[in-house]
Amino acid sequence: MIKAQSLDGLFEKLLDGKSIFKNKEVLRPSYTPDLLLHRNEQINSLATILVSALRGETPSNVLIYGKTGTGKTAVTRYVGKELERVSEDKSLFCSVVYINCEVIDTQYRLLANLARHFEEEVPMTGWPTDQVFMKFKEAIDARDQVIIIILDEIDKLIKKGDDVLYNLSRINTDLRKAKVSMIGVSNDLKFTEFLDPRVKSSLGEEELIFPPYDAEQISDILKQRAKMAYNDGVLGEMVIPLCAAFAAQEHGDARRALDLLRVSGEIAERENQPQVLEEHVRRAQEKIEIDRVVEVVRTLPTQSKLVLYSIILLRSRGREGKNVTTGEMYNVYRQLCHHIDVDILTQRRVTDLMSELDMLGIVNAVVVSKGRYGRTKEISLSVPVENTRKVLLEDYRLKPLVDFKTAVFNKMFS
């Protein structure tokens, strides 16, 4: 008989060990340091636009673009925080409201959050949207003030329509005392193509582009945070250069670099290692990449999942080392659709979905010539097969495909 382990003192034992971290939170994306390195130009540009709020005027609306981890959110929050501090010192009323549109992704939720920020009692569901908008306008127009609304990941919001942006962009015509300005932050340079031309014109009065960091700049950022995050002597000599090099390969993503530095330390600490070494960084890189792939695959549409599963089946059924052609992939895809009773898309549309997987870094597709047989695309996987397969089969619509590889598939390729 197995004796159950006592849980007495479980956390006390873990807390007894000395942590290699001084303050892990400074390595998280939510932390904004007092000094933002290598972003003076962007800070000054945004401050120049927003300074009119301190004169009681309406600042221009701003669109901020740049790839992930280029400091867009950090700069916007940093400048917003400073604006509020100066306005308070000068006894002015200036509010900066930050909204993450990946979380608050509907018109109703956005307006309800704005109204609640100004202490209006609005339920998170149930009211007509017009009523919520009216409550928000009444709340802010009670006094002379300037309000800056930061819409981070604004492209996530417009996927469900741009009505709310249209209404917010025209709100100043309905206000007597308050003035409202918007800052939209996005990783996607093309998202405005889907906007109503009137919204696009109003929202993009000013535009700021954030370039990627280079390896040296990322290294500076990591050194700054490492001093605050880790105890002295904990980091091995190659840890920061390696984190910076990995992140520079990922289009200069400082967020990725900070994640690497944090996860490397977590791996070392869980193994009771006194130092964070190069091997911990390499393992952290692998873990983060798997986590990224899992998240991307999990959120794919069903048809894209079927395309990906077709490629996985072909790669794992005696075709290791051989690339998959679009024709082979489409044949298997059709069988999968039949098997779970899903509509079959045209080969052209399926090829488009495969190209989207290529853009996401999940597969690698290369056009090759077959001589007189024409050209085709050869597809290889850029992600771990088993991890990806498990994530795909978590989808209840794909669960019936668990046994497909030993039934229909064997018949097709026997």
From Swiss-Prot:
SUPFAM superfamilies (UniProt xref): P-loop containing nucleoside triphosphate hydrolases, Winged helix' DNA-binding domain
GO BP term (any one): DNA replication
Pfam families in the record: AAA_22, Cdc6_C, Cdc6_lid
Binding site for ATP: T70, G71, K72, T73, A74, Y213, R225
Keyword Cell inner membrane: no
MF-aspect GO terms: ATP binding; ATP hydrolysis activity
Residues of the signal peptide: none
InterPro entries named among the record's database cross-references: AAA+_ATPase, AAA_22, Cdc6_C, Cdc6_lid, ORC1/CDC6, Orc1/Cdc6_arc, P-loop_NTPase, WH-like_DNA-bd_sf
The protein's role, per its UniProt record: Involved in regulation of DNA replication.
Record-stated family: Belongs to the CDC6/cdc18 family.
UniProt name for this protein: ORC1-type DNA replication protein 1
Organism: Methanosarcina acetivorans (strain ATCC 35395 / DSM 2834 / JCM 12185 / C2A)
